[in-house]
Amino acid sequence: DKYYNKDITTGTQAFNYGMKHLRERCGDDMFIVESIAPLFPYQYANARRVSCDAWGEMWHTNYMMNSLSFGWWLDRVYAYNDPDHLVMGDRSEAENMSRITTGAVTGYFMIGDNLTTKGSYVGTEISQEKVKTYAVNERVNAVVRLGRSFRPAYGHKVSGSNRSVDLFTLETEDAYYIAYFNYDEGVKEGELTLNDLGIDPETISGGIECWSGNSVKVKEGRLSYNLPKHQAEIYHLYKK
């Protein structure tokens, strides 16, 4: 017996053949997410994971954002970038918020905690409570629903143990978004010069920080920030 197509002689041909068959069988009713798949050919999946085995620790967030730092453009190829399952578990509040922020700035959101209350493998109460706290922030979720990957502000500046960009931006028709991560153990504070990020301060009418809902302070073209250990913030600036 023979179970192969003799006309296929390369790995790329085999990948195309198999994925074309899978896509046809799935139809338009199934969302296809590739994990550690080749970047190309790309036309068979709706999304592709930009990093794998990222959990809830800060160094995992740093690792995931390293992948986005250099793979942000892939949401121009696939419909969505996948930042891996977002796990909170027993990590700190700051780590939880930062990990959820990775989903917001990637444009794709999939909770990784076990939330089941019945069965042979029941989830933990702490995971259930944290999801109700951190996965339902409407301002943050509105960023997720944009379905867009932020771009690194400075591609040549990296930090943290996994060497990631810490500052990302996104422009939409009516707003600018800035995401800032603190991968370090200490407080990060200072000012961001909006012009350096390609944002004309004269076009801004105001803004908020999405996690807290606090107003953003922009003075003389600079945005003030104060990020506690392992904290991430998302600044939503309104266009005039």
Report the location of each language-model feature.
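An acidic- and aromatic-residue-enriched active-site/binding cleft used to recognize and process polar
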Residues: 1, 35-39, 183
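The substrate-binding groove and active-site-proximal loops of carbohydrate-active enzymes
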Residues: 1-12
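Glycan-recognition surfaces
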Residues: 10-121
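Generic recognition of flexible, low-complexity loop/linker segments
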Residues: 20-22, 91-92, 99, 164-169, ...
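Glycan-recognition and catalytic regions of carbohydrate-active enzymes
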Residues: 78-87, 112-186, 200, 215
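Hydrophobic, well-ordered secondary-structure elements that form the walls
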Residues: 105, 178, 207-208, 230
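Beta-strand-rich binding/interaction modules
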Residues: 187-212
